Structure formats: structure tokens, C-alpha cells
């Protein structure tokens, strides 16, 4: 694109592991996520009690990491390589964001299977935006983003295809 303000960029990449229980299983998942991303992990808590799954409200049941900047781009390149740079159109939302799953943490380079820990999967969410979208989030002089400046599904597919060589089916 000729206009720099119209070129989409990766705002952030969120890597999430839903374990479903607290305890040693969650601690193992946090350690794996810390090793893969090289960044501190944040715990996710249950929003409500689910007796069928023995989950209580505010119990830690998952963990996540938010990557930005160069770390996000490097992780995204690796994660897309694991899924063979192929995504399905249903993995995109109307705002141009994309989410996909990675079934085994052992697919990442340098990660080996440990029988004491087991195998963990993870969800990767990529938020794509255009420069200037801060105007809708800032405190002073908040404005709406014009419709023609919002990232659409087609824009994000074209961006991922051009920047990362992703094929969308």
C-alpha cells in the first residue's frame, strides 16, 4: 500500500493455555508457556462455578501471555510454520483478527516431550490493526474509527498472505 497509515500491522499475539484445573498441572503449563515465549505468564481465573467440571469461581484454570512488537512477529512466524502456514476462513472474525490452535507444545523448536509433564495444546490469537486506532482508546479527545479505516476480514487475509505467506482455504 502506498499510504503508511493504511498498512495493517500485528498489534499483539495472545497465547492461551486452558488447563481446566489448578495445581501442578497448571504450574507445568505455565512453565511450558514461559519457555516457549520467553516472557512472564499471567494466570486466568474461572468466571463462574461449574459443578459438573468441579470448577469453582475465581479458581485459576489457565494461563496466557501477550506478545507485542518484535517478539510477537517472531512467535507468529514460528507458530504459523507449525500449522504449515495454512488457515481456514472460519478462523478469522469480522474485525480481521485470527485465532488458531496448536495441538502439541512439542512442535515448537527446542521443546521435548517429558513424560512427567505430558502434552499441552494452546490457542494463538492474532490482533491486526492499522496505525491510528489508538484514537478510540485514549482518554482525551476520544473519536470513533471511520469504517473505511477498520481492518476487515479481506484486509487481514491479504496482510497475512503478503507478510507471512499464509494460505487461507
Swiss-Prot record:
GO terms for molecular function: rRNA binding; structural constituent of ribosome; tRNA binding. Keywords: Ribonucleoprotein, Ribosomal protein, RNA-binding, rRNA-binding, tRNA-binding. The keyword Transport does not apply. Pfam families: Ribosomal_L5 (PF00281), Ribosomal_L5_C (PF00673). It comes from the Archaea. SUPFAM superfamilies: RL5-like (SSF55282). GO terms for biological process: translation. InterPro entries: Ribosomal_uL5, Ribosomal_uL5_arc, Ribosomal_uL5_C, Ribosomal_uL5_CS, Ribosomal_uL5_dom_sf, Ribosomal_uL5_N. GO terms for cellular component: ribonucleoprotein complex; ribosome. Belongs to the universal ribosomal protein uL5 family. Part of the 50S ribosomal subunit; contacts the 5S rRNA and probably tRNA. Forms a bridge to the 30S subunit in the 70S ribosome. This is one of the proteins that bind and probably mediate the attachment of the 5S RNA into the large ribosomal subunit, where it forms part of the central protuberance. In the 70S ribosome it contacts protein S13 of the 30S subunit (bridge B1b), connecting the 2 subunits; this bridge is implicated in subunit movement. May contact the P site tRNA; the 5S rRNA and some of its associated proteins might help stabilize positioning of ribosome-bound tRNAs. This is Large ribosomal subunit protein uL5. The lineage of its organism: Archaea, Methanobacteriati, Methanobacteriota, Stenosarchaea group, Methanomicrobia.
Amino acid at each position: 500500500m502506498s499510504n503508511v497509515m493504511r498498512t495493517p500491522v500485528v498489534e499483539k499475539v495472545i497465547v492461551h493455555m486452558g488447563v481446566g484445573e489448578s495445581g501442578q498441572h497448571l504450574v507445568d503449563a505455565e512453565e511450558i508457556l514461559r519457555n516457549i515465549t520467553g516472557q512472564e505468564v499471567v494466570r486466568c481465573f474461572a468466571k463462574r462455578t461449574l459443578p459438573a467440571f468441579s470448577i469453582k469461581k475465581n479458581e485459576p484454570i489457565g494461563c496466557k501471555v501477550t506478545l507485542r512488537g518484535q517478539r510477537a512477529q517472531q512467535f507468529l512466524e514460528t507458530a504459523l510454520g507449525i500449522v504449515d502456514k495454512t488457515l481456514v476462513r472460519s478462523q478469522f472474525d469480522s474485525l480481521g483478527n485470527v485465532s488458531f490452535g496448536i495441538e502439541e507444545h512439542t512442535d515448537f523448536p527446542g521443546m521435548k516431550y517429558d513424560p512427567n509433564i505430558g502434552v499441552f495444546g494452546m490457542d494463538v490469537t492474532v490482533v491486526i490493526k492499522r496505525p491510528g486506532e489508538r484514537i478510540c482508546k485514549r482518554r482525551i479527545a476520544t473519536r470513533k474509527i471511520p469504517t473505511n479505516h477498520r481492518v476487515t476480514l479481506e484486509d487481514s487475509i491479504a496482510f497475512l498472505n503478503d507478510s507471512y505467506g499464509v494460505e487461507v482455504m
